[in-house]
């Protein structure tokens, strides 16, 4: 028997039987996921009001409200039990009544403890779910906004919206909202009990409430402005900090550390002043609430003591009244602090709502046509474009046709309009006038996502995510095989350099690819663009940051890969333009010259002069400097 029993325990503690193991394997995984409709949040549009946002969560909040109501009711029971214990047990010399009141008070305290625990857990989880939903909504909206928004708004200010401003809502939803609900319920319940116990004493206790109400109205008006200013200043601090960190090499190279510190101190002091203003308003209001609570207590003690002396009120009732007054003004003071949290949250919500109210400057029209595969014919028909707030056109009446499979270089001086033209082709911008066409179709009539899926885009400033090299190359095609990733890297001449890194393709590049050289980052960006097998390649001088040896290698790779694909390159080096099928010179937002390299070299225009200057610099032994000095645009 003993051996059988021991064997049973061994079986119980060891591996389960195969049938049980199979059933366990079929069980769904245990997940602690928030009850958030992510699809709804992603599709949500327009400004956000706190009332509307809270209404979406009325079910979970109703449960929290029930727990809050129970908390308030249990709080009302305590002073009544104290009155019973004093009047019936102590004054009445009834030990059983005193014991009953004491045990009842203990039971109420235990239930209140459980209720507060459940209330904290439930409201905390609900609050975190609400904040998660808001973060999803805000991030999805940020992904939709056009380039004009990001060119207008500092990155630090955008980060503030997603972090600090949402954190102010977190304090309200997880703590402040519960405190406010408990406070309101407690104040109403206590007021009702006070009038039930003694009307005269209740009026004495509540006489200060009109003064507190008037102070609250004034506080609301002043605090709203103070906290708006505070949110603006913290965003300015974050924006300056992010810009300073991003440009630290320039700051140190030019010895501008002290100037940067002085600017930061100026912004920091402005934030401090805004915070102190808000703090001063809050301190004045909280101190006034404390003063009024003391006045109410003194009034109850004075009037109540007189009633006890005249035998119109029992001692236990007066003690209960004093306890209720303490309970009355504790939530009132808590409401004052909660109102401070509410004002902070409201200021943050206004900033978040301002971002959510931003309309994407570029979006798919209703019923937009999805495109499977473009031939690659591109055209600009009478295109003009003006940036918001600009006094002049960036592009003016541009007509340009690019045949499928043609490789075209855009050249010109800085500010000529080349980058704007490339952004229009990528549909980062829509023209102010005219049409941009792909295969004869207006880009505004095409589904934006399906159109951009046809593009391979490489910016002049290479950007990599904090991930492995393989993940960065496969960013536009996450399901790509290792062989496909390697093939793209080989095509741009990056394979050997990647293999030489620790971990090879699994090497983590760090934020913005900081563990790689500028040339390596650009090669990875090129491989990323090529991996999606685009119908159209848009390159903002993809070789501008490469040394001469890598430049020749990548130029050869681009020439091979561009075969059969429409390619538009902003050429900062005329050596790049020389290898293209066609060259377009852009000046003052217009097409100045258009032809092959051979044609333009003999046309006597801007291109010929720039080319001759480049050749002269090469002959003088300053190839890199000459090329950059005469052809960068």
Model-identified regions with their sequence ranges:
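Transmembrane helices of ABC transporter permease
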Residues: 60-70, 175-229, 300-313, 330
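Hydrophobic alpha-helical segments in the permease module
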Residues: 104-116, 209-216, 282-296, 302, ...
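ABC-type nucleotide-binding domain
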Residues: 364, 371-633
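Alpha-helical segments in transporter systems
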Residues: 48-51, 59-80, 84, 101, ...
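Transmembrane helix-loop-helix hairpins at lipid-water interfaces of multipass membrane proteins
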Residues: 59-115, 195-200, 298, 302, ...
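Juxtamembrane helix-loop junctions of ABC transporter transmembrane domains
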Residues: 35-43, 66-67, 74-83, 87, ...
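Membrane-integrated ABC transporters
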Residues: 1-76, 90-104, 119-123, 127, ...
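An intracellular "coupling" helix at the cytosolic face of ABC transporter transmembrane type-1 domains
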Residues: 55-59, 147-148, 164-173, 177, ...
